[in-house]
Design a protein with these regions (language model features):
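Hydrophobic beta-strand segments that make up the repeating blades of beta-propeller
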Residues: 1-4, 50-54, 111-115, 162-166
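Beta-propeller blade termini
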Residues: 13, 26, 33-44, 48, ...
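Short coil/loop residues immediately preceding or within conserved phosphate-binding loops
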Residues: 6, 34, 64, 93-95, ...
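Flexible loop residues that form catalytic
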Residues: 4-5, 42, 55-56, 103, ...
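Conserved, well-structured beta-alpha core segment at the onset of a catalytic domain
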Residues: 133-177
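Blade-edge motifs of beta-propeller repeat domains
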Residues: 12-32, 70-93, 123-144, 176
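Hydrophobic beta-strand positions in blades of beta-propellers and related beta-sheet-rich domains
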Residues: 9-11, 50, 67-69, 120-122, ...
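Short, solvent-exposed loop/turn segments at conserved positions within beta-propeller repeat blades
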Residues: 4-7, 59-65, 115-118, 174-177
């Protein structure tokens, strides 16, 4: 998936021989251009669904754009299910990055979203039936100019950790190289 600017997003499919072709009817035509696209099987049906996060509305910087949750029908066609499954996600903020990761140990991918002038936001996945914004130990107060999030077991304790990049000195932790 790539951004087509004011024209929305475009999906390119591999033909199995290393050649990518534009899938003209795969994605919804409405919506802003995506700044970050992340895939996961959010509903447990065996195919990859998409979160398309948007950072800006053309010519209206600072206005929260529309981000989308797209369900894959298994044949490469995606339907916008944001209003039904995750209405709080539609205008979550100016998204710069996101990651699907099980944060609560239920073996379902939850969605963690970061962006400009917004808090780190976690959406709990209730088995693909609904994604709801979690109230999580002070993250509601984490507003910043977030630009990157990476998940991994960085300290070797067997649990997922997150490294989040922020421009500025608002945080309580500072990385020194």
């Amino acid at each position: 998936v790539t951004s087509a600017g004011r024209g929305g997003n475009v999906l390119y499919l591999n033909d199995g021989h290393g050649v990518f072709h534009k899938a003209t009817d795969a994605l919804p035509t409405e919506g802003n251009s995506g700044s970050r696209v992340v895939a996961a099987d959010m509903d447990g049906d065996g195919d990859l669904d998409l979160f398309v996060g948007s950072r800006s509305v053309p010519w209206k910087y600072g206005v929260d754009p529309v981000s989308m949750l797209l369900r894959n029908d298994g044949k490469g066609h995606f339907t916008d299910v944001t209003a039904q499954l995750a209405p709080e996600l539609a205008r979550v903020g100016m998204v710069t990055d996101a990651v699907w990761q099980d944060v609560d140990g239920d073996n379902r991918p939850d969605l963690v979203v970061v962006g400009e002038w917004m808090p780190i936001t976690v959406f709990h996945n209730a088995g693909g039936a609904r994604l709801t914004k979690m109230k999580t130990r002070g993250l509601e107060q984490s507003s910043g100019w977030w630009n990157r999030i990476i998940a991994g077991d960085f300290n070797g304790d067997g649990r997922i950790d997150f490294v989040v990049g922020n421009l500025g000195n608002e945080g309580s932790l500072t990385a020194v190289v």
